[in-house]
Amino acid sequence: MTKQDRAVRTRLALIRSAAEQFEARGYVRACLAQISAGAGVSSGALHFHFANKAAVAEAVEHEAAGALRTAAGHGRDADGSALQRLVDVTHHVARLLCADVVVRAGLRLNAEEYGGRTRDLRREWRECVQGLLAEAEGRGELAAGVTPQRTSAVVLAATTGIEVLAREDQGWLARPSLTDLWRLLLPCLAAPRLVAALDPAGSGPTASGTPVSGAVAGGAAKAEPVGSGADAPGVPAQAYAVGLALR
């Protein structure tokens, strides 16, 4: 291994160790000694890469921002229904948050006040959601009377709330939780002709793979429609209430 390779590995180890500390303790209570110890390096090695705690936090946030922007980019740049891409992006981000402590810590840091913050990740998420909903409106995918402005407020409140709740219980990020949210929202958001084709569990390679319409190759199984099924008690009534908020 070359000296440059070792330096890269050390820096990445420090970023991950810092993310673990920031996630568990927050920016103020995290300390550099614990970060260097967690990475298995000396304090001197840490200061070779980062001048101070704010610089370490900035590196964690930078890595998290890159991962989140990549996820958002998949939604913006992919083909197909804009509403389905919005669903897919939320599932992709949830998987990132479940799997990557750096992404979780980066979002927490971005919500805290500390010196050197240069980005607003929640604003970027808002713009992603608003952009996809505006595209959905332009393509005639939204139900009559549903506006991107009011819809984005509901989606943002729900997804941001899930992220905050998941800091204490990552079960909030599990696919069933997010799928239930979309089972509730999609019948209120989507034009009637599209509802059956949208998959609230996401349409990516790790998603359910079963469209809500229930059409499966070979007719072996049928997916339940959005807002129905034994695992979604009371959803039609709840969906009606949410629909009023969206209009």
Region roles according to the model:
Residues 39-50:
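Short hydrophobic/aromatic patch on the recognition helix
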Residues 59, 70-99, 114, 148, ...:
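Hydrophobic alpha-helical connector segments
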Residues 1-9, 168, 196-247:
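N-terminal intrinsically disordered/low-complexity leader segments
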Residues 62-68:
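Short, basic, alpha-helical segments at the C-terminal edge of helix-turn-helix-like DNA-binding modules
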Residues 26-27, 47:
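Short amphipathic helical patch at the helix-1/turn junction of helix-turn-helix
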Residues 104-111, 115, 119, 126, ...:
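Hydrophobic/aromatic-rich alpha-helical bundle segments in the mid-to-C-terminal region
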Residues 1-25, 32-38, 54-58, 77:
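Basic, helix-initiating cap at the start of DNA-binding domains
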Residues 50, 60-61:
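DNA major-groove recognition helix of helix-turn-helix
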